[in-house]
Amino acid sequence: MARWCAAQGWAVHPLAPGSKLPPANCRRCARPSAERPNPQYIEHETADCQCIEAGGHCHGVRAATKDPDRIDRWWSAEPRFGVGIACGASGLVILDVDDHAGADRPADDDYLPGVQLPEGATAEAFRSGWDTIAALCEVRCAPLPWMDPPTLTVLTAGGGLQAWFRVEDPELWHPAAGRLGWQLDLRAGRSYGIAPGTVTSSGTYRALGDCRTVAPLPSWLEEDLRRTGHHRKPEPKGKRPSARQLLATLRPPKGDAYVESVVRAEVDQVASAASGTRNQTLYSAARALGRFIPAGQLSESEVTACLMAAGTAAGLSDTETRA
């Protein structure tokens, strides 16, 4: 199944036998905790992981690949691995319809946030995500999204469903749980779906029907997903100035040459940080510059803008920099 998925253009990664989760990282990559100390751990950024570069599958979805040789090595070593599908790297979003008995119920107007329920519908009519998606389709006068056009749809081991869709801009979609509706989740970006045939302790994931191709995301559903914040607008090119441009225009109040010199030094260190040290360097810079905010020597927006630009120059994503 992993080779077949890769042949469709989807990036795959292993799931631990009998589980929906990736296998544990190697000792070098397993971050320690108070409960689980690990003296063999080496601080590094996932994007620079030597294990992934060498063909390993540490860090789960971040190791996803379409390389048939690497896939053969992984599943030859452990044929019981399940198959995870990296959404963003595969150009996919996956609508996850849950069937969780006993799940907490929201307020009546939060079963479908921002949508007026069908006439006569009450909270008692909602027993699972199946009822939620049916109600949304009724309001939109649309068929179930995996039916027209048909798309690869997987019945989960827990009684739910995952409907797979193609998108043109996968990097702009991000996952969220319950934002579209009660027991409706979206898998996108660095989240993953589970391929049919994967066996977990709860049962086997199975394809629904005969369709094995993935259809484009229906336009009506795309509109609702955008409305509920699953899609971000692309940042116009050139909108964010580079670290060098920011440094050229930054003028701390009162002509404080010392503050300016510290800002320049810290931003330069972040922008030129070597792989494996970027997160720590960014953290140190944030602490160093943050001390000027209470005194009014720098504004929070100035510090944030400089660090975001420096992080970009260092090769960090916006998410990594904000973290």
Model region roles, listed by residue range:
Residues 6, 160, 167, 199, ...:
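Modules that initiate DNA replication and primer synthesis
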Residues 1-239:
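Conserved phosphate/metal-binding and DNA-contacting active-site motifs used
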